[in-house]
């Protein structure tokens, strides 16, 4: 008999604040009591104060059905002009340390000269797609036009493991993601050659090798993409949608289901995502 998995529930936002740090808002949908929410807001506020970060933060909790089950903590803030996010799975609402450590590390990295996040990311559990997973969240986005290195910097700032963007060199939809011996890979829809900067002899190259996928992205329907992700237990799947010709990103969620990121319209915005 297979062990029963804890089911995570996304709660509607109902912000709580700590009197000491009123600009730190905690959204738990009422699942966290007032003292728990205030304790979390105070802990996050102290990290921000210690690092000299102003402007507050938004903390979102995704909690299990059972009172003592796992909790996903997501913290969004801004450091200077850079949007920042830290996300950590914890043992429960009273287990704040993993989220606070990750938040502190994200702030330190954002305040220094950029370099890729350490790889492998041992504190983070690698997600896979269960056989019964369904698409439960759809995120239409305007993709940003960026170089692969700019996309990697945005991915690291937002604490993602994969990031969908429009490649500035080819105009194709593409993803950068964490995998392989170097920790960084690039997949474009059609072109499989390395980015232009890697083919020149400039004295300053990228900080780490970027491995480019040697095969074009598969052309699939959404249903076929879901089937492939389930069959192989993939953490995510980048594919070209058969109907629109645009790159789409199917990704595994902590609740055991899938999210789907789809580009909106035909245009792209300049800059980082």
Swiss-Prot record:
GO BP term (any one): negative regulation of translational elongation
Keyword Iron listed: no
Molecular functions (GO terms): ribosomal small subunit binding
Transmembrane segments: none
Domain of life assignment: Bacteria
GO cellular component term of the entry, any: peptidoglycan-based cell wall
InterPro entries given in the database record: HPF/YfiA_ribosome-assoc, Ribosom_S30AE_C, Ribosom_S30AE_C_sf
Disulfide bonding pattern of the chain: none
Protein's name according to its UniProt entry: Dormancy associated translation inhibitor
Binding partners and assembly: Interacts with human TLR2. Monomer in solution. In vitro, binds to E.coli ribosomes.
Keywords noted in UniProt: Virulence
Biological function: Involved in translation regulation. Inhibits protein synthesis and decreases bacterial growth when expressed in E.coli. Can also stimulate macrophages and peripheral blood mononuclear cells (PBMC) to secrete important cytokines that may be significant in granuloma formation and its maintenance. Increases secretion of IFN-gamma, TNF-alpha, IL-1 beta and IL-8 through human Toll-like receptor 2 (TLR2) signaling pathway.
Induction: A member of the dormancy regulon. Induced in response to reduced oxygen tension (hypoxia), low levels of nitric oxide (NO) and carbon monoxide (CO). It is hoped that this regulon will give insight into the latent, or dormant phase of infection.
Gene3D superfamilies: Sigma 54 modulation/S30EA ribosomal protein, C-terminal domain (3.30.505.50)
């Amino acid at each position: 008999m297979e062990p029963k998995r804890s089911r995570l529930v996304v709660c509607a936002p109902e912000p709580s604040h700590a009197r000491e740090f009123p600009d730190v808002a905690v959204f738990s949908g009422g699942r966290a009591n007032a003292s728990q929410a205030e304790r979390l807001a105070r802990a996050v506020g102290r990290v921000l104060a210690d690092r000299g970060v102003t402007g507050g933060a938004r903390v979102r909790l995704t909690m299990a059905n059972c009172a003592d089950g796992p909790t996903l903590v997501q913290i969004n803030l801004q450091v200077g002009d850079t949007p920042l996010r830290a996300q950590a799975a914890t043992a429960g609402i009273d287990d704040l340390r993993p989220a606070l450590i990750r938040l502190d590390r994200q702030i330190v990295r954002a305040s220094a000269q950029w370099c890729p996040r350490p790889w492998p990311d041992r504190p983070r559990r690698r997600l896979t797609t269960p056989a019964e997973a369904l698409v439960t969240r759809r995120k239409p986005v305007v993709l940003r036009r960026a170089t692969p290195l700019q996309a990697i910097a945005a991915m690291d700032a937002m604490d993602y493991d994969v990031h969908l963007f429009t490649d500035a060199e080819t105009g194709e939809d593409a993803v950068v993601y964490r995998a392989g011996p170097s920790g960084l890979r690039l997949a474009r829809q059609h072109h499989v050659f390395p980015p232009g900067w890697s083919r020149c002899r400039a004295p300053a190259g990228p900080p780490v090798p970027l491995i480019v996928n040697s095969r074009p992205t598969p052309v699939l329907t959404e249903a076929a993409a879901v089937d492939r992700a389930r069959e192989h237990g993939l953490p995510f799947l980048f594919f070209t949608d058969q109907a629109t010709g645009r790159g789409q990103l199917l990704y595994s969620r902590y609740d055991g289901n899938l999210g789907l990121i789809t580009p909106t319209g035909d245009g792209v915005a300049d800059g980082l995502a």
